[in-house]
Structures are given as structure tokens and as C-alpha cells.
Amino acid sequence: MNTPEKIGIITIRAVNGTINTFVLVIILLLLAFGCYALWDSGQVYSNASHSRYERYKPTIENEGVSFEQLQAINPDVLAWLTVYGTNIDYPMVQGLDNMRYVNTSAEGRYSLSGAIFLDYRNSPDFSDFNNITYGHHMESRAMFGEIALFSDKSYFDARKYGKLFVDGKEYGLEFFAFVHTGAGDREIFRVNIVEQEARQAYLDLILDMAINTRKDVSVTAEDRIILLSTCSPNSTSGRDILVAKIVEDIQSDPFEVIPAETPPSVIPTIDKLPDLWEQVMGWIKNRVSTSKEVDNNA
């Protein structure tokens, strides 16, 4: 073999080695990023899950002791919201503005899943005519991730009740409307409605806009209502709102088994890891075969 041929083979080997090293580094970085994304998705899901807060849930047995512990951790905690037949079973907070708890948990820690919070313009004791609450739509059925399901009439009809714990007392919730609107709807998202005529007009607006309603729930301008608002999964600027009447009587929870929260953002990643690994191993085998061919030709 003459000198030019040897130089060519050495050059090919050097280029091959450089390419192999570069591609391997890229693959390792992608795998590292995938592992981090998997861990991060798990953290978001864990922070959003209602089970994280179960130990703080106020009950008749503990007379709110555990709830008071959560309030000691974060004084902005003011209530507990439960919607029967769903995973909506969370403490509720109120900040100085409506941005405070978009990325902050009920424990006051940074969290992409945020917290369920009452509009800063509302009275903290829920004494207003309309009390507006917000929460993220999570695909894992966490936070307000199940609100959109109330657009289905059978789902809406099956889940009529909930309860609200505030100032050491429990109130019943009777859901009577599901509304879809836009984030900029000033009529729906206004508070401090004092005049009786304005209150009735507000109720009429809700019923006119509602996709689903419950005729057996009588709501008047004298009542108090609560709106559970979240982002619509079908529209960037859309908002899905479940509306309930706040009452003195508390209905029992007819649901013994609630559909479990499932983190869809995590599971597909796990499912794809074997395929990714198979592709990586295939590439390595291919590069090894190529290197052997070069050596044989040498």
C-alpha cells in the first residue's frame, strides 16, 4: 500500500472517530435531557396532586387542626374546596394580586402547577355575591384539570355537589352551570356586584352562556355563588367555568372511588425510552461495523 492510500485511511479513521465521539456526546446529552424532563414532569405532577395536601384537609374529627398547620406555613391559605366525584380536593389561597399563586403552591413554594386561589378582589370570607376562583388545567386530572369534563352533560349531571370549608365552617356547593368563555370576558370576571338588578343580570348572563345547566337548583340575587375557572384545553384564550351556589346544607359524597390522577406527560416519555435506547444501540452497532470495514480495507 502506497503512502497516499495510507494517509487516506488514517484520515478516514480520524474523521470516523471524531464523528463517533461527537454523535455519542449528542446522544448522551439527549438522554440526560430526557431523564431530566422525566424527573421534572414527575415533580410538576407531584406538586399538583391533591394527595400532597391530604394531611392538611380539615375534618370534623380533627376540628381543623391540620388545616391550621397549613395556615401557619402560609397565612394566605383561607379555605378548602372539594368537588365530589373528582380529584378537586385542595386548600385555597388568596394573594395580593392574581399572579401571586400562578406559579406558587399553597405551601408558598415555587411550583409550576401553582395553587387554587380566590380572586384578590373578593372578600376572603366568601361573603361576596360572586366569588371567583382560579386553578391550572392539568392533563393529569390534578388541580382544575377536570373542570373541562363538565362540558359533557352526563358527567355534569352525575356530579352535583361539593363543599367549601372557610373560617372554621363547612358549606355545601350545588353546581348549576358550566360556562365556556374567553379570558377577556369582563362581564363574567367582574366582582363586587352590589345592586340586586345587576346580580340578577349576572345570573341571567351565566345561564344564557351555559353549555350545561341544572334546572332543579334555584339561584337568586340573594344567594352567594362560586365560580371555578380554568384554562380551556381546546383554546389558548378560552376559559371553562363551573358555577355553584353556596348553601348551608352539605350533601354526603356519593362517590367512593374517584378516577385516579395520571400524569400523561410522564407516561409517554417512559414508553418511548426503550425505543430510544434501541435506536442508540442500532447506531452504535452500525458505526462499529463501518469501522471494521475500514480496518479490513486497510
Question: Whereabouts are the PLM-identified features?
Answer:
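N-terminal Lys/Arg-rich, disordered targeting/topogenic segments
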Residues: 1-16
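Sec-dependent N-terminal signal peptides
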Residues: 13-28
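Solvent-exposed, non-transmembrane regions of membrane-associated and secreted proteins
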Residues: 21, 31-298
